Amino acid sequence: VTESAIDNLTTSEIAAAFGADLILLNLFDTLNPKVSGLEVDKPENTVKKLQKLTGRPIGVNLEPVDEKAEMESTKLQISSGRTASVKSMKAAEKLGFNFVCFTGNPGTGVTNRMIAKAVKTAKKNFSGLIIAGKMHGAGVDEPVASEESVKEFLDAGADVILVPAVGTVPGFTSEELIKIVKIVHKHGGLVMSTIGTSQESSGAQTVHDIALQNKIYGVDIQHIGDAGWGVVPPTDTI
């Protein structure tokens, strides 16, 4: 949302044109809605206009920041419209988002404990699909994904569990992913593996191999991140 591809052309439209089934907006401020390259008559029509142009469901990242998190890196401060709160969730509902994703960008101090809390809050304030989990540590000293945290997200009401794709985060193994997939599927949920640690800017073969391997491990949805030019993945990797 921070960079347009060219004048009056959003990166969301490019992603949709090259095969993206779902569009997830990162760094989007729900209290100050705007997308670079998108012209709207009123800010409150931003999401609806993007849905019309792309023909895709549109979601938003909201970050459940933990003020008490034990950080491994310098903590970054983000706007209130990007954090997971009752106010931002109600704003996302009003804007017309189809789904929310509770996760953390690098250095934001998002913890699994706060993700579970955000899911519970969202069940009362947002009517769309709820995705929950971490793509990487988000600067916090805790396991990125574990069976315990996954169970907490499911019990809180998450529809889709987000995990790092095997091959994107050091130490997260196929054995761990397979166990998580079985837990989620038994609960009736879906699993989304993510390429969110810059591998999306690698060659197409690298992305192909990661996606194929994680599909073999049982995931249902493959995410690809925003580390390419103009904060959209190179089109050949989509």
Set out the residue ranges of the language-model regions:
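Active-site-adjacent loop and "lid" segments of alpha/beta metabolic enzymes
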Residues: 9, 70-82, 140-147, 190-215, ...
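Short, composition-biased local secondary-structure segments
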Residues: 58-63, 119-124, 150-154, 171-187
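Generic hydrophobic/aromatic pocket-lining and core-packing "Φ" positions
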Residues: 12, 89, 119, 150-151, ...
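Active-site beta->alpha loop and helix N-cap motifs at the rims of alpha/beta catalytic domains
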Residues: 2-116, 129-147, 154-155, 159-167
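Catalytic-face loop-and-helix region of soluble metabolic enzyme cores
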Residues: 160, 164-231
